[in-house]
Amino acid sequence: MAMATQASAATRHLITAAWSPSAKPRPATLAMPSSARGPAPLFAAAPDTPAPAAPPAEPAPAGFVPPQLDPSTPSPIFGGSTGGLLRKAQVEEFYVITWTSPKEQVFEMPTGGAAIMREGPNLLKLARKEQCLALGNRLRSKYKIAYQFYRVFPNGEVQYLHPKDGVYPEKVNAGRQGVGQNFRSIGKNVSPIEVKFTGKNSFDI
């Protein structure tokens, strides 16, 4: 018992020194990897390939002057979103449709939702040509409004697209050249076996 008391007395100063209250505890720090601090901001990489050159525009029919695009034309009043332009708009092209409204009225957007067209000229940017056609057909059928749309390239070049000769395709236009037109019935085509392996179609002969 006395030996145990002497041993504890001999080692008490060591324990006191090791657990001295004067020694301030050091706060533990946790080094977090950069991936745990939150997602890193994403930036769109610049395209490696240069923007393709615009294809040569077809000559306009004689007597028709394509209308010029005015970039200062106001857009319709729309509180929603058209979904933005596609990625290809930065490296290829996007489309612009214009029309002139006799009054301020509500119309349906091809991307969903309703917007208010302004009285006078309107301009709307869309990502696809099919969206311009859908909106244009609606403007002509319901509102009796003529429209035009254009293709805009990344370098700023504007190409007039539709209606190509100033008259919509479903209308007759004197002097318009037919494409793939054959003035005969399908029963008067040659037999397909006669043109097999020739690289031609029965309606081409």
UniProtKB/Swiss-Prot annotation:
GO CC list: chloroplast thylakoid membrane; photosystem I reaction center
Keyword check for RNA-binding: no
Keywords, alphabetical: Chloroplast, Membrane, Photosynthesis, Photosystem I, Plastid, Thylakoid, Transit peptide
Transit peptide limits: 1-43
Induction behaviour: By light.
Membrane-topology descriptor: Peripheral membrane protein
GO BP of this protein: photosynthesis
Sequence ranges of Pro residues compositional bias: 49-59
Domain of life of the native organism: Eukaryota
Biased composition (Low complexity): 39-48
Region (Disordered): 18-66
SUPFAM superfamilies in the record: Photosystem I subunit PsaD
Location within or outside the cell: Plastid, Chloroplast thylakoid membrane
Principal location: plastid
Function (record text): PsaD can form complexes with ferredoxin and ferredoxin-oxidoreductase in photosystem I (PS I) reaction center. PSAD may encode the ferredoxin-docking protein.
PANTHER family: PHOTOSYSTEM I REACTION CENTER SUBUNIT II, CHLOROPLASTIC (PTHR31982:SF5), PHOTOSYSTEM I REACTION CENTER SUBUNIT II-1, CHLOROPLASTIC-RELATED (PTHR31982)
Family note: Belongs to the PsaD family.
Name of this chain's protein: Photosystem I reaction center subunit II, chloroplastic
Species: Hordeum vulgare (Barley)
Source organism phylogeny: Eukaryota, Viridiplantae, Streptophyta, Embryophyta, Tracheophyta
